[in-house]
Swiss-Prot record:
GO terms for molecular function: dihydroorotate dehydrogenase (quinone) activity. The active site is at 172 (nucleophile). It comes from Parvibaculum lavamentivorans (strain DS-1 / DSM 13023 / NCIMB 13966). This is Dihydroorotate dehydrogenase (quinone). NCBIfam families: PRK05286.1-2, PRK05286.2-5, pyrD_sub2.
C-alpha cells in the first residue's frame, strides 16, 4: 500500500523532522509499498563478496536507528544503510534542524548525529539477523568523545556479524571537527585502527565530503588504496551554497543535500574514480532524483548509488522509476550488465 500521494499535501505543511517521524512509523506498521516484480538481470552486480539485485540503496540518515531496513528492502531497494549510529545515545542539535528548499528540491540539515546509540541498534539488528537483504551500518563518533577513532573501533566491534558492510562517516559537517579526520595523517591512523578492529572480513567503506580540494582527494585515494579500504561513498552533504536563490531556509547552516549537490558530488565521484584507477568500488550519492541522475553517477564511476532527499519530494514510486529507467538506458547504450557501464565517461 502506498499512502504517499494521499499524505504528501499534509506532510509538506509539517516540520520536516516531524513528517519524517510519521513516515518511519507508517513503515513500521507495514504501510509502505512492496516490489511486485523481480529486478532486471542487467541491474545486478557483485561487490565486496555480496550480490546486489540492483544498485539502488537508501542512504544513511533516513533510518538512523535501524527501525525500517526491511521495509526499504521490500520497497525495492537493492540495499539499505542504517545510521549514523554512535556508541552512546545523543540528542543532536536543537530543533528546528531540518529545512526544506522546495524550489531547489533540496534539504538542509544540522541534525548532529542524533541517534539511540549502539545498544538500541544492536538489539534491533539481532532481532532481524536471519532476514535476507544487504544491510550496511554507518558508524560515527559521539560529539564529546575524547578519542573519536575509538568510537569507530567500537562500532566495528558492536556490529560485526550483523552488518553486511560498514560505512565510516567522517564527513558530516554537523559534528564540530569531525571532517578533520579526512586529513592524511589522521586518516591513516583512523583507517589502520578501524581495519585492525575487525575480526573478520566485513567490508569497510569510507564516506567523504564533497568540499575537498584536489590535494585532499588525492590523499584519500592514496590512503584508501594503500591501506586496503573496500570502497568509498561519494559524497556526504555540502556546506557550499552556490546556486541557491535567497529565500526561505536558503541561509540556514548545515549540510545541503538534494538536487544542488548533484553536480559537485558527481564531479568528486569522477575525480575519485580517476584517482583510484577504477580499482576501488565507489558508491555515488548526492542529488539523485531520476534514472538519468543514477546513470550519470554510474558512468562517472559508481558501482552502486544511494538516494534520500528525492524521496521526500517524490515518495516511494521513485524507486521503481529509477530502476526501470536505468535498465532502459543500459540497454539503449549496449551494456548487457551494469558493471560494463561503470566509469564509461572517465578517461583513466
Amino acid at each position: 500500500m502506498d499512502l504517499f500521494p494521499l499524505a504528501r499535501p499534509l506532510m509538506s505543511l509539517m516540520d520536516p523532522e516531524t513528517a519524517h517521524g510519521l513516515t518511519l512509523r507508517a513503515l513500521r506498521l507495514g504501510l509502505g509499498p512492496t516490489r511486485r516484480a523481480p529486478d532486471p538481470v542487467s541491474l545486478a552486480i557483485d561487490l565486496f563478496g555480496l550480490h546486489f539485485e540492483n544498485p539502488l540503496g537508501i542512504a544513511a540518515g533516513f533510518d538512523k536507528n535501524g527501525e525500517v531496513p526491511d521495509a526499504m528492502l521490500a520497497m525495492g531497494m537493492g540495499f539499505a544503510e542504517v545510521g549514523t549510529v554512535t556508541p552512546l545515545p545523543q540528542p543532536g542539535n536543537p530543533r528546528p534542524r531540518v529545512f526544506r528548499l522546495p524550489v531547489h528540491r533540496a534539504v538542509i540539515n544540522r541534525l548532529g548525529f542524533n541517534n539511540q546509540g549502539h545498544a538500541a541498534l544492536k538489539k534491533r539488528l539481532l532481532a532481524r539477523r536471519k532476514r535476507p537483504g544487504i544491510l550496511g551500518v554507518n558508524i560515527g563518533a559521539n560529539k564529546d568523545a575524547a578519542d573519536r577513532i575509538a568510537d569507530y573501533e567500537a562500532g566495528i566491534r558492536a556490529f560485526e556479524g550483523l552488518a553486511s558492510y560498514f560505512t565510516v562517516n567522517i564527513s558530516s559537517p554537523n559534528t564540530p571537527g569531525l571532517r578533520a579526520l579526512q586529513n592524511k595523517a589522521e586518516l591513516q591512523n583512523l583507517v589502520a585502527r578501524v581495519l585492525a578492529a575487525r575480526k573478520g572480513k566485513t567490508p569497510v567503506l569510507l564516506k567523504i565530503a564533497p568540499d575537498l580540494n584536489a590535494e585532499e582527494l588525492g590523499d584519500i585515494a592514496e590512503v584508501a588504496l594503500e591501506q586496503g579500504l573496500d570502497g568509498l561513498i561519494v559524497s556526504n552533504t555540502t556546506i557550499a551554497r552556490e546556486g541557491l536563490v535567497s529565500g526561505v531556509n536558503a541561509n540556514e547552516t548545515g549540510g545541503l543535500s538534494g538536487a544542488p549537490l548533484f553536480p559537485m558530488s558527481t564531479a568528486v565521484l569522477r575525480d575519485m574514480y580517476r584517482l583510484t584507477g577504477g580499482r576501488l568500488p565507489l558508491v555515488g550519492v548526492g542529488g539523485i532524483s531520476s534514472a538519468d541522475d543514477a546513470y550519470a553517477k554510474i558512468r562517472a564511476g559508481a558501482s552502486l548509488v544511494q538516494l534520500y532527499s528525492a524521496l521526500t519530494y517524490d515518495g516511494p514510486p521513485l524507486v521503481a522509476r529509477i530502476k526501470q529507467g536505468l535498465a532502459a538506458r543500459l540497454a539503449a547504450d549496449g551494456f548487457a550488465h551494469l558493471k560494463d557501464a561503470v566509469g564509461a565517461d572517465v578517461n583513466l
